[in-house]
Each structure stands twice: as structure tokens, then as C-alpha cells.
């Protein structure tokens, strides 16, 4: 204390104080500011250390929860979008990017506020605005603004001079550069880039260890360096009932597309979407720009409520992982699937304005030259092989393996080559499936030999062939159709059915030829003359003729509706050419069969029955053909029953003023319908009449109850049951006030003990009531003291007494 310098009174006094006092005050203030800044810096360091520890040593589950808090309302999460951007600011290392980071935002700001502010500025508009939040929902003070192109981001930064004012606060803007992804891992199943700390794939749930083991080292670098861009992109996760118009509407803000630019792949059996579609653009640059726009959408692209995945149609991620041989196999399988989708969509949409070209490969793409060479070689080999089968069936055994190997490499030319086989024949579908049949232990390469006994077919051992839709029998090499129960031999191109008595496979055409020839039947019995059964070649020719007519009619309707594009014209020409070629081919066979039938037919004994008369080949039965001819003949004759010049109905012998009245008479008149029915029955033979009556009986509802009543009569109705009557038992209950209150009650005894005598009134001077109070019935709903509320009823009165008292009360009221 002695060493401290005491300030004198004169030094303390003064207007502004002494110089020493001012110096001490300045020193204390500077010391306080330094202490505050040191405390703030240390607190920031501690908070940063805690954040780093939380970020580095947290579990994957906690990290997933923290990142889920930053999701948008629709729940979309892109693994590696904003979480991979570097938040630290270094001006020297800043590079231009299409993503801009806004730092120093107010805590109360929202994403909608930032969007409204961005929309108020002129120039390019952002593609997405992302505000980073904590788990509690509070803003972390920075956000990301992403533009579609790098030029838009740089021009926007230059226009605002890297400064922005939001809610009166100056905001710093910087380019956001993503951190390197060398520590992330790529999923081998869905090709999604995942964080290094994620043990399972975010999209498909695949294990990280499996992906690292399957993908060889150096694959990721090779994938990034190879240029695998093409002019077609694929849309995945499409709803089963989505149409092309919905896809065009969803993509219209980003690209100008036509109907023929979109290929929606459908299932051949259910006619529903298979979950993906192709969008072809004019160039690879346009496809790359569209893909970049669609992948940067937040929220992502949605069509009919389904989130759509977008990628190049020919991606190098999967092709480079495979070996060269597997790559060619996958390449051909994909082409076959697209060709099959083209065939199914062409059949289902033939009446909706023509078919659409679903071919995926275009000239100039990778593998197109090799694929075209395979297609040409396969077609030449198939034509030679077909000629060899016609000349000598035994030559097929030496070339079956070659056919199989060629079908493995290129499976779709058989689908496009429609001029050699008519549509609908299993040749187009069974030939590609020979690649799968080589794995099964087939019998002889020549197939089933007629006349040889075989074991009973076991359908449980059959293998389903997706390319043809049939079931493959590995023991015989035949294809089984469960709908028609027929077998198809892909080598001889014949339909067969199983004969249980002979224990062999009998060709369908052979059975009809046996019926036409004079051979005696297997069962000998009474003689019966029958009309010949079906002529397979002749009826196939008629079916081909009807098919060609329908195609030509559809083509005429399509031309009259609107002018088609060139691709549709070529497709129509191919279909009409296939129809004409198929009709000419089967017409020759039909004429040959007709010439053979000109020989006088012998009387046949016994019944000739085809064991299988249903399904694919059973549709060519003789009865169905005669019915069609009969209907055509009757229709032509019915047209002659109307005289359109005189406007008269020759059948009903009536004349009409105009054409509309005649048509209305033919369609609505009961007289015309009755006469037409009589006319049709008169033109039929006895057998046709019996068949018609049988068909009508089968179609008509049979009232068995009416038949039973007509045969046995109506039984007499049973006597009604008498209702049981129960006598209600009388209940004796006490009525104490019915005969009046006597002197035996407790109240009377108490009053007598107090000096009261019967007949005198109550009270000291006996001025009170002399009779006991009686309960009276009041009128329902009447208030106390109202007129007519009570008319002297008591609880012990009977109904008769109550009526009498009520009548008397009303009489007195009237007076």
C-alpha cells in the first residue's frame, strides 16, 4: 500500500480530470476489448472443434438423421449433392461453378424468401435454392443457389458484384466447389455414388463390401474417362398405366419432343408398361443437356406420382465392368427385348394410328456394324437352312448347333423379317428361344419322329421360355402351348398333339389328311356318312386372306385420317408386303389341297373325332369354317331382300318414302325380325337347323322350377300355423286409497294420541281440514293453477270413472 501512488486532491479536481486518469481509463478499455476478443475466438474454436468431432466421429445412423433434417418437404435426398460442397472460404482456390453459396444469412430467413428475392432480379433464374438447417429446423446461416448452366451463374455473380442485401443485411456470395470424391464408393447394382461412411447403398441397400469386391480397381477412372454419350436417354420407374402424352407433358418445359421421339416399352402379355421408356433426341449434345437438366431438378422429375430416374440409354458403367463376350451377349439381349416390345406394341396399337418404330440402335453407334453383320449372316443362314429342311429333313441335325449359336448372338432379325413367316406363327418366337434350349438335355436334333412311342408328357418338368411365351420340353425339344395344348416343333415347323392311345406325337396336318383319305378309321362300327373335316392349308390361306384384308383396310383408314410420317409409311409397306407374301404362300398350298380333294370321296365308317379341338390349331376346324361360309352366304342373300330403288322391303312387302324409313324398318320392326327369322330357318338344312336349335337351347336359360311344376303340378300350400295365445296373469297389488283411509293407519293413531278426534279439524281451534289429502291426477302439460288442469281424478279411479269425471268437468266449463 505504501508503494501505491496516491492521487492528490488537486489532481482529482478539474473540469476534465487529470491526464493520468484518462490514460488509465484508455488502458482499461483496450484491455477489456482484447479480453473479449480472446474469449470470442476461444469459444469459436471450441465450437468448431465440437462440430468437427461430431462430423468425423459420429455414427452412420446419426449422420443419416442429421442429413434427413436437411431434406425438403417431398423427402427427396440426393446422396452427394450439397453435402459434398466445401463450406470453407478460400478466395485463392475459388473456381467458377454453377452453384453459388450465400453466407451470413439471417436466422429467420426461409427458402421462399430467397426464391422471391432471386425472382425479383432480372436475368437467369436459379434451378434450385437450398437452405441448410440444423436438426432443430433453425437455419445454419448459409444456403446454396444452383443454376442450370455455368454461364448463368457467372453472369449473375458479375451482375450483383458478389454482394447481396437480404432483409437489410449484406450477404457474401462465393462459388461452391465440391470436395473430391476419391473416398466415396460406387454401388455395383444401381450405380449410385455413396458417401465413404455409408455401409449400405442409399438407394438399393447393397453392401459396400460386395461392391468393392466385385468392381475391379481402376474401373471408376476408366468409366469417367470413356465417352459413352448417345442421343437417347432412358426413363426408369415409370408407372404401369402411364401413357406417352404424360411423358411429353412432363418433358415439355425442358425439350421439344414429338410422339415418335418417345418409346414406351410395354409387356407383351399384360400390355402394361414395363417400367422404363426411351427418349431419343436429335443429337448427343441435346441428350446430354436434357439429362443434366433432369438430374439437377429438386424435387426430381415426377410422372403420375412416380419419381423418375434418368440416365443415358447406353451407359458405360455396366458395359465396362463386363467382359467382351458378356458385353456382346447383354447387347444382343437388350436389342431383342426392344424388338419384342416393338412387336407387342405394334399388335396392340394397330388400330390407333399405325405402329411406332421401336428400334433402338442407330447408325454410328457402338456395335451397330457388328450387329448388322450378325443380322445379315443370320438371315442368309436361316434361308439356306429352311431350304435344306424342305429338301431333306435329316440335314437339320448337322446345322442345329449353328442355328443355336447364331440365335445367341443376334435374336431380333427373326422378328423383323416378317416376309418369311406370317405374324402370329411361333416360328418368330420359337427360333430365338433355341439359345435357352441348348442348355437343356434335348433329344435328337431332328426333333420328334412320327410313329415312335414316347413317355407320357410331364408338364412339371417344362421350362418357361420368355422370348416365345411357350413352355419348353427338354426331353423332346418341343414347345408346349398351354392354351391350345398343342406342341410345336421348331425344326420341322409343325404343330403336334399328344395321342394317348398311340403314345406318340401326331402332327395336326397329318390328322386332317388321314380324314380326307380313304383309309379306314381305327374304330369300326355302324356306317355313317359325314362331311370332310378341316383342310388345314386351305383354311390357313383363308385366314391369311382375311388378315391381309384387315391390314389393307386399316392402312386405308390410317391414310384417310392424316398424313403419316416417312417411318410410319415404311412400316406399313413392310406389313402389307408381309401380308401379301404370306397370303401368296398359303394360297398355293390351299389350291394344291383343293385339287387333291376333287377325287370322289368314299363312304367312311365310324366316327372320326380329333382328340384335341380347341386352342390355336383347333380354330381351323371344319365346323367353324362352314359356319363362316354360311353366315357370309346368308348376309349376301339378305342384302337382296331390300329394293333400294323403290324403297321397299321385299320380305315384308312394304314400301317406304325414303331410305331412312327403310333402314329403321330393318333394324327396329318386329315384323321384319320375325319374317327374317322364318326366312333364315327356311334356308337351312336339317342338320343346320338341329345345330341352331341346340345352340339356342344352350344359350337360353332353362327354368327347371317351371318344368318341375308342369310335370308334377303345384303342391297345395300348407295350412297357416295358429298363433299361440297366452292369458296374461292378473297381478294383485295393494290399493290403500281405493276404499278410503281408515282409522288404522299410523297417522290417525298419532293424531288421536295428541288429542285429535275424528270429524274435527286440525289446529288449535280445529279450523283445519277434516278429511285426509288425496292424490289427484293432473292434465298432462297443464301448469299449476291453470284452468282445466285437474278434474278430480285420483290414482284409484278406474277408466270408467275417469271418463265420467272428465265429461262432467267439460260440461261445467261450458256453462
Curated annotation (Swiss-Prot):
Residues 321-809 are annotated as: Required for interaction with U2AF2. Component of the spliceosome A complex (also known as the prespliceosome). Appears to dissociate from the spliceosome upon formation of the spliceosome B complex (also known as the precatalytic spliceosome), in which the heterotrimeric U4/U6.U5 snRNPs are bound. Interacts with U2AF2; this interaction is direct. Also interacts with ACIN1, PRPF8, SFRS3, SNRPB, SNRPN, SNRNP70 and SNRNP200; these interactions may be indirect. One of its GO terms (cellular component) is intracellular membrane-bounded organelle. SMART domains: G_patch, RRM, ZnF_RBZ. SUPFAM superfamilies: Ran binding protein zinc finger-like, RNA-binding domain, RBD. Residues 411-422 have a biased composition (Polar residues). Residues 1-93, 411-468, 507-540 are annotated as: Disordered. Belongs to the RBM5/RBM10 family. Residues 426-446 have a biased composition (Low complexity). It comes from Homo sapiens (Human). Residues 452-535 are annotated as: Sufficient for interaction with ACIN1, PRPF8, SFRS3, SNRPB, SNRPN, SNRNP70 and SNRNP200. One of its GO terms (biological process) is mRNA splicing, via spliceosome. Residues 98-178, 231-315 form the RRM domain. A zinc finger (C2H2-type) spans 647-677. This is RNA-binding protein 5. Isoform 5 is widely expressed in normal tissues and is expressed at increased levels in T-leukemic cell lines. GO terms for molecular function: DNA binding; mRNA binding; RNA binding; zinc ion binding. CDD domains: OCRE_RBM5, RRM1_RBM5, RRM2_RBM5. InterPro entries: G_patch_dom, Nucleotide-bd_a/b_plait_sf, OCRE, RBD_domain_sf, RBM5_RRM1, RBM5_RRM2, RRM_dom, Znf_C2H2_type. The modification Phosphoserine is found at residues 18, 59, 69, 72, 78, 444, 621, 624. It is found in: Nucleus. Keywords: Apoptosis, Metal-binding, mRNA processing, mRNA splicing, Nucleus, Phosphoprotein, Repeat, RNA-binding, Spliceosome, Zinc, Zinc-finger. Residues 743-789 form the G-patch domain.
